[in-house]
Amino acid sequence: MFVVGATNPAIRMLGPVYGKDSGFTQLEIGIFLSLALIGGVAAQIPIGYLADRFDRRKVLITLSFLSIICSATLIIVSGDNFYIFSIFVFLFSFFALPLFSIAAAHANDFSEKEFFVDLAVSLIFVYGVSAILCTVIVSSLFEIFGSGVLFIYIGIVHLILCVFGAYRMTIRPTVEDKKPYLAFPRTSFVFLKMFKKSKSD
């Protein structure tokens, strides 16, 4: 969760600086920041489906690795071809933004039901602290190396996540019993209970 907080907020908070230094117009900066969110929205159901059918750590590592590839591509094409840049911003968002949800689900897999709320609070706290630290760290790197370091930083942090995830897989088994992924809108408590009852029947 710390790694997720140390990467995803960097684009939202310092993306405008990166875009301006890369020579983007104001419209292009707006498109850049929009795509950095749209990809994550588009990924929720398909990535959630995969995370509920495979080891969540494998999904985390795979998505993080794909985020590294997108980051490397964005480093190469930045400022040269905005259309290609936009495609890979969308893809980066598609792979990187669901990491928060999957990491939270993975943590819940090893938690008792009575600790779910405490766990959620802890995860959000860790995410918030890492997001604050990432803003300070990345802005400091901007001062030293320039804004082009943004996706280098993001790629390195995702690499750390890949290595750590692979290490954790060697020392802790996966959770085998998983409920099938089911997408339904948020609604009233009464309807939610009826919905669960109908599914159990």
Range-by-range predicted roles:
Residues 26-27, 111-123:
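Loop-to-transmembrane helix entry/capping segments in MFS-fold secondary transporters
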Residues 58-73, 155:
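Structural signature of the two symmetry-related core transmembrane helices
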Residues 140-158:
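A membrane-interface helix-boundary motif in multi-pass transporters
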